[in-house]
Amino acid sequence: THMCVGSTVGPNIFVKICAWSTAQISRELMIQVKEEFGKLPRKIKLLNCVGGGSSAMGFWNEFMDTDAEFIGIEAGGPKNSKLHAAPLTNGSKIGILHGSAQYVIQDSEGQIGRTESISAGLDYPGISSLHCYLKDTKRAKYTSASDEEALNAYQMVSKFENISPSLEPSHAFA
């Protein structure tokens, strides 16, 4: 059998392959930041939505050896609901999902729990082992945005920037 996955989750080799391939995002960002400012600013804060974690890893990769501050925003689910897709910010415990130890949403028996988010791309019960490490070592901070906050951010960005972001980055805009 073979596992095909499009995020930085699962056994280590899949995490490495996906993180390497998405790192082009941060390589390009590093070039653009240096062109804009002449050098890398002393203070830089990089925010990104986090589901499985590949987008954020791609965005942050080239900045890991700098003093950049990383903030990941998970899917907090609907307000007034206990369901969410935010294992790092809602007290989830370590479990095994897709062959990897990670923070994972679990039910009372330790089975994979239900999730809910307006954003299909963030609606995942686990999180990359890389993000678990970044959280535990305090290299990155994590928070969550509710479905309603993401929708409000979507409307504001659409109105003021004249672009229509997907629901995933709308969580980060919130």
Show which residues each predicted segment covers.
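A glycine-rich, Thr/Ser-enriched phosphate-binding loop motif common to dinucleotide/cofactor-binding enzymes
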Residues: 10-29, 166-171
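A short, small-residue-rich loop immediately preceding and capping a beta-strand
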Residues: 42-55, 70-73
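Short glycine/serine/threonine-rich phosphate/pyrophosphate-binding segments
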Residues: 49-60, 80-82, 169-174
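Active-site/ligand-binding loops adjacent to catalytic centers
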Residues: 1-12, 17, 37, 65-67, ...
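Buried hydrophobic packing segments
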Residues: 25-29, 59-63, 154, 172-174
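Phosphate/pyrophosphate-binding loops at sites that engage ATP/ADP/AMP, CoA/4′-phosphopantetheine
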Residues: 30-41
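Short catalytic-loop micro-motif centered on adjacent basic/acidic residues
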Residues: 45-48, 142, 163-166
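C-terminal structured "cap/appendage" subdomains that terminate the fold
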Residues: 158-174
